């Protein structure tokens, strides 16, 4: 089984700032959230933990790992999407027109394209499928990669920008939501 958790809360989450790959730590509430989720998942059998290397995910993994006592492997492929020059800006300052421009040409914002993100997430999932057979793996990452993981598992190798934007970009993922990839490689919310 593969369990996937979104990191705990940051100040930028509260401020509705676009975080992207800006390295923001958990706030006090985020630390408490991670401690609470650790209690809720304490009965899971976890063989290994893989985390995004960004502070908010890694701190979440460290707090959870106090229960499981595993070596935390970091993987840059699990980083949040790079939003380039839009990082740090509050959502109310980013108009729909700016988002539309961003979705048409992310490079003009010094950001990753969705195809680049898809390829790194695909690479991660393919590696974890082949290298973690018969292991229960806990992955700590961000909302964007979780959406892209779902897209890849639902649609396979062919990335379609319009389909992703229409069907997956709006998937609501809260801090410390848990998902599971089952034996059939379907991503589902994990209810405790």
State where each predicted segment sits.
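Extreme N-terminal starter segment of soluble prokaryotic enzymes
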Residues: 1-3, 48
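Generic beta-sheet signal
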Residues: 2, 133-143
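Active-site-proximal alpha-helix that buttresses catalytic centers in soluble enzyme cores
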Residues: 9-68, 97
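Phosphate-handling substructures
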Residues: 25, 66-123
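Glycine-rich phosphate-binding loop signature in dinucleotide/nucleotide-binding domains
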Residues: 43-45, 128-135
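Short beta-strand scaffold positions
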Residues: 51-52, 119, 140-141
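GST superfamily/GST-like fold recognition
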Residues: 143-147, 177
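Domain-level recognition of soluble alpha/beta enzyme cores
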Residues: 157-188
């Amino acid at each position: 089984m593969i369990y996937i958790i979104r990191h705990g809360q940051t100040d930028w989450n509260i401020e509705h700032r676009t975080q992207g790959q800006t390295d923001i730590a958990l706030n006090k509430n985020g630390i408490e959230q991670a401690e609470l989720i650790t209690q809720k998942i304490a009965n899971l059998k976890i063989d290994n933990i893989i985390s995004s290397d960004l502070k908010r995910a890694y701190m979440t993994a460290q707090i959870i790992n106090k229960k499981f006592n595993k070596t935390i492997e970091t993987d840059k492929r699990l980083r949040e999407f790079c939003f380039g020059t839009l990082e740090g800006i509050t959502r109310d300052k980013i108009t729909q027109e700016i988002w539309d421009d961003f979705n048409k040409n992310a490079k003009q914002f010094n950001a990753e394209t969705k195809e680049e993100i898809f390829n790194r997430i695909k690479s991660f999932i393919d590696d974890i499928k082949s290298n973690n057979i018969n292991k229960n793996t806990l992955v700590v990452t961000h909302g964007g990669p979780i959406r892209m993981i779902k897209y890849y598992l639902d649609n396979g190798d062919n990335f379609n920008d319009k389909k992703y934007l229409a069907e997956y970009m709006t998937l609501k993922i809260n801090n410390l939501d848990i998902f599971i990839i089952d034996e059939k490689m379907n991503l589902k919310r994990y209810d405790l």
